[in-house]
Swiss-Prot record:
Keyword Nucleotide-binding (UniProt): yes
EC annotation from Swiss-Prot or TrEMBL: 6.3.2.2
Family, per entry: Belongs to the glutamate--cysteine ligase type 2 family. YbdK subfamily.
Highest taxon of source: Bacteria
Keywords: ATP-binding, Ligase, Nucleotide-binding
EC class (word): ligase
GO biological process, one term: modified amino acid biosynthetic process
Function field: ATP-dependent carboxylate-amine ligase which exhibits weak glutamate--cysteine ligase activity.
Record protein name field: Putative glutamate--cysteine ligase 2-1
NCBIfam families assigned to the protein according to its UniProt record, in alphabetical order: gshA_cyan_rel, PRK13517.1-2, PRK13517.1-3, PRK13517.1-4
Catalysed reactions listed for this entry: L-cysteine + L-glutamate + ATP = gamma-L-glutamyl-L-cysteine + ADP + phosphate + H(+)
GO molecular function, one term: glutamate-cysteine ligase activity
Length: 383
């Protein structure tokens, strides 16, 4: 089958931020997304009663809303867009006694008790995936970056795969699951890959190979739409973007901006390499798979595999080298401040580390963890 790749301006940006709705007193998940979305629409008279807000969306579970930016030129613009949408949500949730937070998972609310949004595609997903599908009490951040040529898509995807453990380690924020410490930095990473077509992307040498794969998925009934290919990094042909979906949910707008800047800078760097006739190295899939597991297990303490030769380095050391290398790219894109915020995540600890600290300070009380995440979203990162 032929798959067109939409025209897109190079290195433009879009961000999706999935937020959990919780009871402000107990910290338990609150399945009130429908009420929140109705309230948001009511506060915007330009929308009809049944119209969906263009930047505030439904998700799989009724305890979730998703903030979606428009097409942005800079990370600062994307952050401002998300901030405006978050304020619109708060106009509705504050009087309801509902708070919002973001992490890779909820620390203690039972996954099996969370109602699913009443839509045919969600019902089909749960019917097919059963127990695993009902466990998807997970939240993430997705970053789209525009590509100006279809020929760049697969090499850029391969380039981002090389940085999979960096994104996973920085964002890891799901150490707890159903009230238990899993021992992992990111439970979400290993949970989400249980769904059909989720997980690491395949490697393709040509766009025709990718088209053939998609055709096979349609022919065998694996997917009904191309969006059901839920890889951790994927092309989005109708938008003309590459979408980085690796990250656990991020607690603050500052952290979302940092991850968006790192994504935008890497994609722009890869694009420039290709424009200049260069190539982007790839790693064997067994190294890629191992890197995903190491980052999910150990987070910022992971020793990662750097290349096909099997050279290894502490992920934070390689991140700092990468940030230095990307400084000129960030200056060109206008995201130097946001890229510098990546180093702040390293210095104060990723979400999984901060959650464990709060739990330890409160005798293992995971309600305190949720309330701290709520506070971070309102006030910014805690030291």
């Amino acid at each position: 089958m032929k798959i067109d790749f939409a025209s897109s301006r190079q290195s433009t940006l879009g961000v999706e931020w999935e937020l959990a709705l919780v009871n402000a007193q107990t910290g338990e998940l609150a399945s009130v997304a429908n009420e929140v979305l109705r309230g948001v629409s009511a506060n915007h008279p330009e929308l009809n009663e049944d119209d969906e807000h263009p930047h505030i969306k439904q998700e799989l579970l009724l305890n979730t809303v998703e903030l979606v930016t428009g097409i942005c030129e800079t990370v600062a613009q994307a952050k401002a867009d998300l901030s405006s949408s978050l304020a619109a949500v708060r106009e509705v949730t504050d009087p309801m006694g509902v708070e919002v937070f973001c992490a890779g998972s909820h620390p203690f609310s039972p996954p099996q008790l969370q109602p699913v949004t009443d839509k045919a595609r969600y019902a089909k997903l749960i019917d097919r995936t059963q127990w695993w599908g009902r466990q998807m009490v997970i939240y993430g951040v997705h970053v789209h970056v525009g590509l100006d040529s279809r020929d760049k898509v697969l090499p850029v995807l391969d380039g981002l795969v090389n940085y999979f453990p960096h994104f996973q380690a920085l964002s890891a924020s799901s150490p707890f699951w159903g009230g238990e410490d899993t021992g992992y930095a990111s439970q979400r990473a290993l949970m989400f890959q249980q769904l059909p077509t989720a997980g690491l992307p395949f490697q393709f040498s040509t766009w025709a190979e990718y088209e053939s794969y998609v055709q096979d998925m349609f022919t065998t009934g694996v997917i009904d739409t191309i969006s059901e290919i839920r890889w951790d990094i994927r092309p989005v042909p109708n938008l003309g973007t590459i979408e980085m979906r690796i990250c656990d949910g991020l607690a603050t707008l500052e952290e979302v901006g940092a991850i968006a800047a790192l994504t935008q800078c890497l994609v722009d760097e890869f694009s420039t390499i290709l424009d200049n006739g260069g190539t982007i190295p790839t790693m064997p899939p067994w190294h890629v798979q191992e890197n995903k597991w190491r980052a999910a297990r150990y987070g910022l303490e992971a020793i990662i595999i750097l290349d096909a030769e099997g050279n290894e380095q502490l992920v934070t050391d390689h991140l700092l080298e990468t940030l230095n290398r990307l400084e000129p790219v960030a200056a060109k894109l206008g995201c130097s401040d946001e890229l510098a915020d990546v180093e702040k995540i390293i210095s104060r600890g990723a979400g999984y580390q901060r959650q464990r600290r709060v739990a330890a300070e409160h005798g293992g009380d995971l309600r305190a963890v949720v309330l701290d995440l709520v506070k971070q979203m309102r006030n910014g990162p805690t030291a």
